[in-house]
Amino acid sequence: MYYTRITQIERLTDEVATLYFSISLRSYPGQFVMVYVPGCEEIPLSLSSSNSVTVKAVGETTASLINAKEGQYVGVRGAFGSAFTPSKRALIVAGGIGIAPMKYLYEYLMKCGSKVSVVYGERTAKNLFWLDKFDRITVTTEDGSFGLKGTVLDALKLEKLDEYEKIYVCGSEGMLRATYDFLKERDALDKAEFSLERYMRCGIGVCGSCVIENGLRVCADGPVFNASELPW
């Protein structure tokens, strides 16, 4: 485990913040780290760059992180897990805090000269962030307060999916499964990669707490899976 100093905290919404570390990890988009705050449980977090995580306050540890102070030290293990497969023509589909690892992926692909489009969905406009980070982006909100009213599926209906080599998906379990079903109906599932999230204890495939229905471990076999690997 590394003990790293928080060099900067960028508050993005009332519930979301990006924490920048004093170390840069050897990592690829899609991988995650285990983060430890003294007095709290160690948790997995996707990297939003080689030296940052973007966190939504949903529990004790995440609340402690977004309310941390610059200069504070936290423990970090990783990076762990599988990464997204690069492609030249890519569609990124993100729901909610699922946009966090996708920014890392987007920046990586753009440096590789790829053509990248983004679909980003939230419940309401006040939850949106990073809209200025993406050149080609379609935004959806469920209440219609910004962009297209509806979910990411409504935006996907407007996309010519056959133009993309890869479709990368990250979001809530419900969003992932709905997108999986949609892509299956459109015969586009073979080009899709999904980033899953599960409760983890070890992060290295030993404890078995993150096993999915077919026996694969999100921490060691994922968190990025080809659609064909998922039991949906």
From Swiss-Prot:
Domain of life: Archaea
Annotated organism of origin: Archaeoglobus fulgidus (strain ATCC 49558 / DSM 4304 / JCM 9628 / NBRC 100126 / VC-16)
Function in brief: Responsible for channeling the electrons from the oxidation of dihydroorotate from the FMN redox center in the PyrD type B subunit to the ultimate electron acceptor NAD(+).
Domain FAD-binding FR-type: 1-86
Gene3D superfamilies linked to this entry: Dihydroorotate dehydrogenase, electron transfer subunit (2.10.240.10), Nucleotide-binding domain of ferredoxin-NADP reductase (FNR) module (3.40.50.80), Translation factors (2.40.30.10)
Cofactor note: Binds 1 [2Fe-2S] cluster per subunit. Binds 1 FAD per subunit.
Protein name: Probable dihydroorotate dehydrogenase B (NAD(+)), electron transfer subunit
Named cofactor requirement(s): [2Fe-2S] cluster; FAD
Complexes and interactors: Heterotetramer of 2 PyrK and 2 PyrD type B subunits.
Residues binding [2Fe-2S] cluster: C202, C207, C210, C219
GO biological process assignments: 'de novo' UMP biosynthetic process
Pathway(s) where this gene product acts: Pyrimidine metabolism; UMP biosynthesis via de novo pathway; orotate from (S)-dihydroorotate (NAD(+) route): step 1/1
